[in-house]
């Protein structure tokens, strides 16, 4: 009887731990200040991340809403796609699997369709899933597909699997596109990944980022990077009650066991997609420190499938 009560208390404890709310947070209306009508609107950014999964011959609900917003946007605007542009595993070679290629093409086309009435400029950056099909080769297939579809070389950054690239939006705004998967991935698996890049090691990457931030400290500097530096989602070690019951997000619950799996994930840092990972932590600490060289740095990221 004692042991039964003991296990019951453990189960209740795990359930209470999982009872956090991860709904979208809104600022109370009373705290919103008035924006001066004399302020000049320099540029508008429309952000979407992890948009690389849509039904065949259709768009996801998020992309439909995104397209509607872009249709009303003016010329001085940018649509920024924050990586993971193709689920589940990047752009395959058409010769290897026709079905996989058609699904990947569908997922990209659904995003490109959002730009049909858009008067501004689109920018795509890569995420970790975009590296999951032959690494650099799959990434370059995606890059070339987007460039060809949009008839422009100025739409996918950084190019050629390189880590960082600066894009001048206007005289007062600069965007720095960073491929965080370049930093996090196992380089031994991609021996040719830096052949087309001026930057060939991680330390030089940080030096270049520091230089760009300092040179543009008088301009609003947007760092577009797929992996977030801060997160209250699963990649940051925060799990909803649903994920405590089934870490994979499936239908069948695994109480206690599911929470144990999440605990191991949170404390081990085994996955370099999670903030607790040693290399991810290294990237985060250095990047956050460098961002403080300017008071005008804004971080924008995807990765987590939430608004935060």
Where are these regions (language model features)?
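Positively charged n-region of N-terminal signal peptides that target proteins for export
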Residues: 1-6
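Bacterial N-terminal signal peptides
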Residues: 10-17
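N-terminal active-site segment of His-dependent metallophosphoesterases
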Residues: 19-102
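Extended active-site neighborhood of metal-dependent phosphoesterases/phosphodiesterases
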Residues: 22-33, 90-221, 234-274, 278, ...
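Residue-level marker for buried hydrophobic side chains located in beta-strands
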Residues: 45-47, 79-81, 124, 223, ...
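Active-site glycine-centered loops adjacent to acidic/histidine catalytic or metal-binding residues
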Residues: 50, 83-84, 127-128, 178, ...
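Glycine-rich phosphate-binding loop signature in dinucleotide/nucleotide-binding domains
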Residues: 69-74, 215-218, 294
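Short acidic, glycine-rich surface-loop motifs adjacent to enzyme active sites
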Residues: 81-82, 86, 216-234
């Amino acid at each position: 009887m004692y042991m039964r009560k003991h296990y019951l208390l453990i189960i209740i404890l795990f359930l209470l731990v999982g009872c956090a709310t991860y709904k979208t947070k809104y600022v109370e209306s009373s705290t919103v200040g008035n924006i001066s009508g004399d302020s000049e609107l320099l540029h508008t950014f429309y952000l979407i991340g992890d948009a690389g999964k849509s039904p065949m011959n259709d768009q996801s609900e998020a992309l439909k809403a995104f397209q509607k917003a872009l249709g009303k946007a003016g010329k001085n605007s940018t649509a920024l796609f924050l990586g993971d542009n193709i689920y589940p595993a990047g752009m395959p070679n058409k010769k290897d699997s026709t079905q996989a290629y058609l699904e990947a093409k569908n997922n990209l086309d659904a995003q490109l369709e959002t730009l049909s009435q858009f008067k501004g400029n689109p920018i795509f950056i890569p995420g970790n899933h975009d590296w999951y099909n032959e690494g650099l080769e799959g990434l370059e297939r995606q890059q070339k597909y987007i460039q060809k579809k949009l008839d422009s070389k100025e739409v996918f950054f950084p190019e050629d699997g390189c880590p960082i690239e600066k894009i001048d939006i206007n005289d007062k705004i600069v965007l720095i596109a960073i491929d965080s998967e370049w930093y996090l991935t196992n380089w031994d698996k991609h021996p040719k990944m830096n052949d087309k890049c001026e930057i060939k090691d991680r330390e030089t990457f940080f030096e270049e980022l520091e230089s760009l931030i300092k040179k543009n400290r008088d301009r609003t500097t947007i760092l577009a990077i797929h992996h977030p530096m801060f997160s209250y989602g699963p990649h940051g070690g925060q799990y909803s009650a649903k994920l405590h019951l089934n870490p994979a997000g499936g239908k069948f619950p695994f109480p206690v066991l599911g929470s144990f799996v999440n605990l191991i994930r949170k404390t081990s840092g085994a996955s370099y997609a999670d903030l607790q990972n040693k290399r991810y932590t290294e990237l985060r600490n250095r990047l956050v420190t460098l961002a403080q060289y300017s008071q005008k740095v804004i971080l924008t990221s995807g990765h987590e499938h939430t608004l935060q």
